[in-house]
């Protein structure tokens, strides 16, 4: 029944934590890292399941592997298939021809706004002491202050962007014009991390002269994505922007999966 594959099941997640006090058994991370050829993961959250520090119970499973195994690229195809209604509005069962929605969005998966949580989860998955970001002063703020640093590196950006260009080489181009195009989506008019991401994009793009480049700010991109999805071929962006944009894009294809 497993089609020749050897299957190992690892109980884990929030419900498992409530029952056992552990997010998963000791040695599970090492097994996934050293023994598994592929990992298929179900939902890990459970209502009311949190660690003493407030983190989601089960986070060291999905987030720990994401950071601990350096799974840096979240590759999300967005495609509307024949006969599948999109979810833009219930009354509009068909706005685009299916062939007009066919793009791939690449989200950087280890840095950015989630970096502290990812690194903390990876440390926990390895049985090490949890990570906390260094203290930062914020002049002018009053009362309790919570913060999440948003580190973005040239190394992390360039390898994600390079994968985007390589994927673009394997595709037929954007649906509207068959042009091979990689779009850089950021907020480089505001944040330094995004300015570095865009510079990294420009550096990588010089190695792919036969692929067109495109730029957009994330706020404007959200309206372009739903208004003219046929323009997009491959999109590269940072962690949280990609998290939000791909959930939005899922309505173009009728759902998350």
Placement of each model-derived feature along the sequence:
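N-terminal glycine-rich phosphate/adenylate-binding segment common to multiple enzyme folds
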Residues: 17-136, 146-147, 240-242
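Short glycine/threonine-rich loop-to-helix capping motif typified by GTGT followed
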Residues: 19-23, 190-201, 226-233, 250
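Glycine-rich phosphate-binding loop
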Residues: 31-48, 204-205, 210-257
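Glycine-rich phosphate/diphosphate-binding loop of Rossmann-like nucleotide-binding domains
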Residues: 1-2, 126-219
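Short coil/turn connectors at secondary-structure junctions
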Residues: 2-5, 34-38, 70-72, 93, ...
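N-terminal beta-loop-helix "entrance" segment that forms/cooperates
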Residues: 2-27, 225
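Structural signal for hydrophobic packing residues in well-ordered secondary-structure cores
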Residues: 2-4, 33-36, 65-69, 73, ...
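Short, ordered loop/turn segments at secondary-structure junctions
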Residues: 12, 44, 80, 187-188, ...
